[in-house]
Regions:
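N-terminal signal peptide
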Residues: 10-21
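A structural motif
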Residues: 19-302
Length: 302
């Protein structure tokens, strides 16, 4: 009950914020957690949060360990019941003196102070942790201690409400029409889900695919402002670190894809539950076998 209430209390205005945190326990993680870092040996690390000392603290989970780890009171503490972050976001460099706009809250102190999701390199690892804006300090769970840091990356929202038919400033095109017109990643509520699709500013149209059709959307859209790498896949494959763009009617995640079709590079979705990928094109929901999936970019380890 505590964790369910927390989702409602801390969720942002994003279309899919209620899906961002999923319950977990020692020995098992949700099916599609969002990778946020790694151990020195390359093992991925994920963002965790748990009720702790009358607050909700943010930490890390290593899938090879039993439980998650929370930094609090100078100590790295293990917890057996927790939630794992399964949403999206962009990592922005920051310091303890300046929190960037759109920072994602993930927890709170006992006095209600919000805690924000951060990560930082430490002894060859990239470790998720928390930032307290009152103390102006970041904290990581590492080596049995609560490690204090002053320089880190903050997770910020990478979906923003779309006003009109122009992409937000500074957003790069992710695809193109056969005539070369750029296409941008958007998403919109459809049925009981939220579906990724495409925006064509040249003709002022926004489309998602749903129920066998290409559906033109005129309201309620969000634009993707993040970035990543495109990884080739086919036949229902989902590469590690795939970025979720929404969810289907049954709650299954939908990943952001693009595929070559009719001379263009079109944007769409991939549903791992059905093993199928689709793009909206020519009034139809077109199934594609070969596609590229947008995944998080971690850069070099060090």
């Amino acid at each position: 009950m505590i964790l369910i209430a927390l989702v409602l209390m801390l969720s942002s205005a994003s279309l899919v914020s209620a899906q961002d945190w999923q319950p977990a326990a020692a020995g098992g993680l949700p099916q599609w957690p969002t990778p946020a870092g790694y151990e020195a040996d390359g093992t991925p690390l994920y963002i965790a949060r748990a009720p702790f000392n009358r607050g909700v603290q943010i930490g890390k989970v290593n899938p090879t360990h039993a439980g998650a780890y929370i930094p609090w009171g100078g100590v790295e503490s293990s917890v057996s019941a927790f939630e794992v972050y399964c949403g999206s976001g962009a990592w922005v460099p920051a310091t303890a003196a300046a929190l960037p706009p759109g920072a994602v809250p993930g927890g709170k102190e006992a006095d209600g102070t919000p805690l924000y999701i951060i990560r930082a390199p430490l002894e060859g690892s990239l470790v998720p942790g928390k930032f307290n804006p009152v103390f102006h300090k970041g904290y990581l769970p590492y080596g049995g201690k609560e490690q204090e840091i002053q320089s880190f990356e903050v997770l910020v929202q990478d979906w923003v409400p779309l006003a009109g038919v122009q992409p937000p400033p500074g957003v790069a095109a992710a695809g193109f029409e056969a005539n070369g017109a750029p296409l941008y990643i958007v998403r919109a509520p459809m049925g009981n889900g939220v579906h990724p699709g495409k925006l064509n500013p040249a003709n002022g149209r926004e489309y998602v695919s749903y129920g066998g059709r290409e559906v033109e959307m005129t309201s309620g859209l969000e634009a993707f402002t993040g970035s990543g790498d495109w990884v080739a896949a086919a036949d229902g494959e989902v590469p590690f670190g795939a970025i979720k763009g929404g969810y289907d009617d049954d709650g299954s995640p939908l990943f952001i894809i693009r595929a070559r079709y009719q001379g263009g590079m079109h944007l769409g979705k991939m549903n791992p539950a059905s093993g199928k990928a689709y793009i909206p094109y020519g009034g139809q929901e077109v199934e594609v076998v070969a596609y590229e999936v947008l995944v998080y970019h971690f850069g070099a380890r060090g």
